[in-house]
Amino acid sequence: MKEDRVVFIFGPTAVGKSNILFHFPKNKAEIINVDSIQVYKEFNIASSKPSKNLMKHIKHHLVDFLDPEKDYTIGIFYEQALKIVKEIRQKKKIPIFVGGTAFYFKHLKDGFPSTPLVTSKIRIYVNNLLELKGKSYLLKELKNVDPIRFNMLNKNDIYRIKRSLEVYYQTGIPISQFQKKQSSEFKNIVIIGLKRSFEDLKTRISIRINEMLNSGLLSEIKGLFSKGYNENTPAFKGIGYNEFLLWKSRPCYGLNDIIGLINKNSFLYAKRQMTFFAKISDVLWLHPEDDLDNILNLIFKVDKEI
């Protein structure tokens, strides 16, 4: 029994990931969503959550369950995903990871470093260091305590600079030492990458944004603002939401300006996704429509073997 096999399906925004799932046979698989914004409640339209019809057709996990004020990290995702895979396997179904958050897929494939939890006291301490002494001080400190990590990091990546120092202050051990121990939980992975031409993606992104507006995106945004969600709300970091913060704070930005910005940011994000996905090895790149039969055969041949 090939119980250790999982399937990854990834691709850029608007490539057509959700559409192919309607062709999957019922009761053969379950979907583990790989998206850092679709996890949030209330943020529905611009996040392109799976439709009710799709979720009725095939069970989805990690969608629409988290308070918008809560942070969602790769560590939380990874822990939840491993637990869900075990549950799906117990049902003799295929666990299929589907989404576009490339960073999550990287760690699913390569393993997630077993870095320790950090207390809020340590986080506050590091944030205070940043505010009082600045980024240059944090970089100098990181270079002293973990030169390996210092040389690896983008010096503008303040999140990972802070995270590296937090782990060191919590444990006294450089984060680079923890990362040496990482290895994947999955040994048998079918990896399918969905691709289209950039011209096709650009057209589909524009169509999707128009569909979002017709589905009530503006009303959703106004409702979110009325509930007090703002630039400090983690869910507002997503494309299609973040741009409306400008609309709220700067009256000079009209709705057409915001729509244009969403279009631009979505396409740039799609290009970044493809650049990141291209670094992942052992991927079968297929077209979501032209190669649909091949996709179904690749996935559900697994079903015949378990």
UniProtKB/Swiss-Prot annotation:
Entry keyword set: ATP-binding, Magnesium, Nucleotide-binding, Transferase, tRNA processing
GO biological process terms on file: tRNA modification
Record-marked site positions (Interaction with substrate tRNA): T101, R123
Functional description taken from the UniProt entry: Catalyzes the transfer of a dimethylallyl group onto the adenine at position 37 in tRNAs that read codons beginning with uridine, leading to the formation of N6-(dimethylallyl)adenosine (i(6)A).
Chain intervals for the UniProt region annotation (Interaction with substrate tRNA): 35-38
Residues that, per the record, bind substrate: T13, A14, V15, G16, K17, S18
Similarity section: Belongs to the IPP transferase family.
Catalytic activity: adenosine(37) in tRNA + dimethylallyl diphosphate = N(6)-dimethylallyladenosine(37) in tRNA + diphosphate
HAMAP family recorded: IPP_trans
A single GO molecular function term of this UniProt record: tRNA dimethylallyltransferase activity
Domain of life of the organism encoding this protein: Bacteria
Record's protein name: tRNA dimethylallyltransferase
Keyword Membrane annotated: no
Enzyme class: transferase
Known cofactor(s): Mg(2+)
The enzyme's E.C. designation: 2.5.1.75
Gene of this entry: miaA
Binding site for ATP: G11, P12, T13, A14, V15, G16, K17, S18
Complex and partners: Monomer.
